[in-house]
Regions:
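Periplasmic/extracellular loop-to-transmembrane helix junction in inner-membrane transport proteins
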Residues: 1-25, 37-46, 188-197
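C-terminal transmembrane helix and the adjacent membrane-cytosol boundary/short C-terminal tail
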Residues: 45, 106, 110-124, 128-129, ...
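Interhelical loop and adjacent transmembrane-helix boundary motif
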Residues: 1-8, 171-211, 216-219
Length: 231
């Protein structure tokens, strides 16, 4: 199996997994908070927040990548200040994780929000009347009930992050060994004569990773559902 892919191809696969995992893990707490706010809170600007969250799904990925570059690039609005403390996103794998997280965030929020909206608010209110604080109500009542949706949202975000191309290549380019992820490596193969075989190998790897993630998500969701029914 090791000889099936070249060292550069393995590097692209490993980098994609690293980027997708970091993008999912870092964005998950923000995804839960945003989904909770959109599902349970009523506040001025709620629809604006909802629109901003889903904007990456509507904008061309290249536009999102350009906005990230103008914001978090070394001369960007925020990036120039981060650069002074040694935090660099542009043309770095961390920037690839940021771009992947931004593009995957809407899918994560939507899945978690639907799960929260499916929870009967009276269950949360009953716990609150017994003296439980809002964080404790969330941890002991809401979170167990939305766990299947949370898992689904995380897997959707991971899959989207694994396949992210447009925003990533615009923001961090495609530097072999540094920012060249699986999709950008496939694209690079397709730009050279005779690169179809290498692209095909990486396509099969991408399919295998996606199927593994989906099967694992389904298994975890069913395991959680069985445990809840047993409880």
């Amino acid at each position: 199996m090791t000889g099936w892919l070249s060292p550069d191809e393995w590097t692209a696969v490993a980098l994609s997994l690293k980027v997708a995992l970091w993008a999912t893990a870092v964005s998950l707490p923000f995804g839960v908070l945003t989904a909770w706010a959109l599902a349970r809170w009523r506040f001025p600007g709620r629809q604006i927040l909802n629109g901003l969250v889903h904007l990456p799904l509507i904008l061309p990925p290249v536009v999102t990548g350009f906005l990230l570059l103008r914001t978090f690039g070394r001369r960007g609005i925020i990036g120039q200040w981060l650069d002074q403390v040694g935090i660099v996103f542009a043309f770095n794998w961390t920037g690839a994780a940021l771009a992947a997280g931004v593009m995957a965030f809407p899918l994560m929020v939507r899945a978690i929000r639907l799960s929260i909206e499916a929870v009967d608010p009276r269950l949360e209110q009953a716990a609150a009347t017994l003296g439980a604080s809002k964080p404790w109500v969330f941890l002991t009542v809401t979170l167990p009930l939305i766990l299947p949706g949370l898992i689904a949202g995380a897997v959707l975000a991971f899959a989207k992050a694994m396949g992210e191309f447009g925003a990533t290549i615009t923001f961090v380019s495609s530097i072999p060994g540094q920012t060249q992820t699986l999709p950008s490596a496939i694209y690079a193969f397709l730009q050279v004569p005779g690169g179809g075989a290498g692209a095909a190998r990486l396509v099969w790897v991408a399919i295998a990773i996606a199927m593994t993630a989906l099967v694992l998500s389904e298994w975890l969701s069913q395991a959680v559902a069985r445990r809840m029914r047993g409880a």
